Amino acid sequence: MAKKIIGFIKLQIPAGKANPSPPVGPALGQRGLNIMEFCKAFNAQTQALEPGLPIPVVITAFADKSFTFVLKTPPATVLIKKAAKIDKGSSKPHTDKVGKITRAQAEDIAKTKMPDLTAADLDAAVRTIAGSARSMGITVEGV
């Protein structure tokens, strides 16, 4: 018989930098989960990724105090800002443009994000990424 699920916890944690301090400690502690066990497992799975890149994670907590977790792809906005080499998007996105990315960069981001996007193919995923970039005040060349 399957274990009884008592809840899901959604967090964004920098790759390789999970530690018991907030937000990880309080979120897991409320459900009675082993915080250090999660931190070690998360850091082990994300050590191949760029350190500090925020990684969304969904933790499934079970009634017997065990857990499983699923890593998602980094947020599109973080990848877009990194590609455009900017710190933050525009405060007036459709008026003030703060950077540019090429279609090739948008395709790379779309390939990275593909498992988490609902797009049917790569072209649709590129258009999704281009829309996110435009809403941040970043021009996408060739789309």
Curated annotation (Swiss-Prot):
InterPro entries: Ribosomal_uL11, Ribosomal_uL11_bac-typ, Ribosomal_uL11_C, Ribosomal_uL11_C_sf, Ribosomal_uL11_CS, Ribosomal_uL11_N, Ribosomal_uL11_N_sf. One of its GO terms (cellular component) is cytosolic large ribosomal subunit. SUPFAM superfamilies: Ribosomal L11/L12e N-terminal domain (SSF54747), Ribosomal protein L11, C-terminal domain (SSF46906). Keywords: Methylation, Ribonucleoprotein, Ribosomal protein, RNA-binding, rRNA-binding. One or more lysine residues are methylated. GO terms for biological process: translation. Gene3D superfamilies: Ribosomal protein L11, C-terminal domain (1.10.10.250), Ribosomal protein L11/L12, N-terminal domain (3.30.1550.10). PROSITE patterns: RIBOSOMAL_L11 (PS00359). GO terms for molecular function: large ribosomal subunit rRNA binding; structural constituent of ribosome. SMART domains: RL11 (SM00649). It holds the Pfam family Ribosomal_L11. The keyword Cell membrane does not apply. Part of the ribosomal stalk of the 50S ribosomal subunit. Interacts with L10 and the large rRNA to form the base of the stalk. L10 forms an elongated spine to which L12 dimers bind in a sequential fashion forming a multimeric L10(L12)X complex. Belongs to the universal ribosomal protein uL11 family. PANTHER family: 60S RIBOSOMAL PROTEIN L12, LARGE RIBOSOMAL SUBUNIT PROTEIN UL11M. Forms part of the ribosomal stalk which helps the ribosome interact with GTP-bound translation factors. This is Large ribosomal subunit protein uL11. It comes from Paraburkholderia xenovorans (strain LB400). The lineage of its organism: Bacteria, Pseudomonadati, Pseudomonadota, Betaproteobacteria, Burkholderiales.
